[in-house]
Amino acid sequence: MSVHIEAKQGEIAESILLPGDPLRAKYIAETFLEDVTCYNNVRGMLGFTGTYKGKRVSVQGTGMGVPSISIYVNELIQSYGVKNLIRVGTCGAIQKDVKVRDVIIAMTACTDSNMNRLTFPGFDFAPAANFDLLKKAYDAGTEKGLHVRVGNVLTADVFYRESMDMVKKLADYGVLAVEMETTALYTLAAKYGVNALSVLTVSDHIFTGEETTSEERQTTFNEMIEIALDAAIQQ
């Protein structure tokens, strides 16, 4: 048992999916997993373990933003020995050729968060995904005929941004999309020597205003979850 997770030892699998929304964690468990048990309800941040294609997998809500996901990733690794962590969530596209419903796999993540500068004063640490997980997820996506993009994303500390100037500059440098957690996940995975990946669906385009319908979001979300689960059980 840790501060924010009430699971007993052995109740959490070595491979885990990390949606921000705890209700998405519940949806994933109920829709994709078999023999499901709920191991956590502290602060309503639900966690479940079950099997997918006969292999144990867990799913844990993390909340939104760098501070929140950092809490859960630290505890999952340090207290429960989790080895493979895959964030599943949504993002906003900032490239013209990235469309809503595309799947983005984050190879790395730049950020406006000060998280890493507190650890590396005067340096810009560049956290990266685990290549084996990335390749497995990419292959799973392309086999399903999905439009999968691999590249850099922005992990933002601010959701309601007053100025988009920096986001536009990052787009000029090839950043694909904006989300709020990947930098923290990849940095902590590097610190503890475990494997991490972010698989994201494009829910909207920040510059064009294009958005997905709720039905489109759910369909694309399901495809993303299958990609993540297929990668997780092969690791």
UniProtKB/Swiss-Prot annotation:
Keywords on record: Glycosyltransferase, Transferase
Enzyme class, first EC level, given as a word: transferase
Site entry: Important for catalytic activity: 217
Family annotation (SUPFAM superfamilies): Purine and uridine phosphorylases
Gene Ontology molecular function, alphabetical: purine-nucleoside phosphorylase activity
A Gene Ontology BP annotation from the UniProt entry: purine nucleoside catabolic process
NCBIfam families named among the record's database cross-references: deoD, PRK05819.1, PRK13374.1
Protein task: Catalyzes the reversible phosphorolytic breakdown of the N-glycosidic bond in the beta-(deoxy)ribonucleoside molecules, with the formation of the corresponding free purine bases and pentose-1-phosphate.
Subunit note: Homohexamer; trimer of homodimers.
UniProt cross-references to HAMAP family, sorted A to Z: Pur_nucleosid_phosp (MF_01627)
Family to which this protein belongs: Belongs to the PNP/UDP phosphorylase family.
Name of the protein in its database record: Purine nucleoside phosphorylase DeoD-type
Gene source species: Bacillus cereus (strain ZK / E33L)
